[in-house]
């Protein structure tokens, strides 16, 4: 099949790579334009554009795609069978969706219609979902509202964070894309149906994964410990707090269980009814901080201007005192 691939971040590369190595022909790649991302205002290409350049594939980086007549005519001239779209960054308008012979397919990193939108991986972790997955859908003009064609569910491990889960779903997306194109080819060869069968999603809850905002990265110590833990995993490694006026990125924590709280080694802890207070500083355990519910131990963090530090290094760097506060 003649394929045009649409994608922008590193997350998309697994899918592009698998199609390049397949029997299909990737005739062009569409990605977001170069952006100024460094202090020197140097223009930086998207990861997908850089990868496509290495593979000597024709690349388009239009500033706009809606009502872009020249770009649309160029796409039409390529006689494409299928558009493969993963994390491109813009919703494709009707005039583009109608170009390829067999439609436009998108891989979405959730169990649709749960977590439609821009940040499904973050919100599945933030809300403590037990499972997530990838769905291949035939795109329409809506926000992740197209027909679901193929889906695979995976369990979210307790140790998963944004980085690890993103990698798993990126690889799964590539596999499902290839499976879906194989199924489509089987149908075409049988002359039975030039489309895949729509999957049934009736009864599933519809939720929306809005974009992550700057304020979301702040740790609210007045929240339940489990919610704080989920946020740190979901926004890894950027969830942060403030200590003595300096930014402190929270990389990894442990929520103390009831049995651990009652253990003798934590007897230095004061009343932890006030959230965000340092309850204890234990050399072999770490810095213990109160929340709305159970206390947490700070296992890894990054003070501004420093590298990521272990619990013992943090004690040496911060020299925290009992009763000090961490602010939102």
Curated annotation (Swiss-Prot):
Q: Which reaction does it catalyse?
A: L-methionyl-tRNA(fMet) + (6R)-10-formyltetrahydrofolate = N-formyl-L-methionyl-tRNA(fMet) + (6S)-5,6,7,8-tetrahydrofolate + H(+)
Q: GO cellular component terms?
A: cytosol
**Which InterPro entries would you find in this protein's record?**
Fmt, Formyl_trans_C, Formyl_transf_N, Formyl_transf_N_sf, Formyl_transferase-like_C_sf, Met-tRNA-FMT_C, Met-tRNA-FMT_N
Task: Indicate the enzyme's highest-level EC class.
Answer: transferase
Keywords on this record?
Protein biosynthesis, Transferase
EC number in record: 2.1.2.9
Q: Which Gene3D superfamilies match?
A: 3.40.50.12230
Its domain of life reads Bacteria
GO MF term (any one): methionyl-tRNA formyltransferase activity
Record keyword Protein biosynthesis present: yes
Presence of the UniProt keyword Cell wall biogenesis/degradation in the record = no
Query: Residues that bind (6S)-5,6,7,8-tetrahydrofolate, according to the entry?
Result: 110-113
Q: Which family does it belong to?
A: Belongs to the Fmt family.
Q: What does this protein do?
A: Attaches a formyl group to the free amino group of methionyl-tRNA(fMet). The formyl group appears to play a dual role in the initiator identity of N-formylmethionyl-tRNA by promoting its recognition by IF2 and preventing the misappropriation of this tRNA by the elongation apparatus.
- Name this protein carries in UniProt: Methionyl-tRNA formyltransferase
According to its UniProt entry, this protein's organism is Prochlorococcus marinus (strain MIT 9312)
Which gene holds the coding sequence for this protein?
fmt
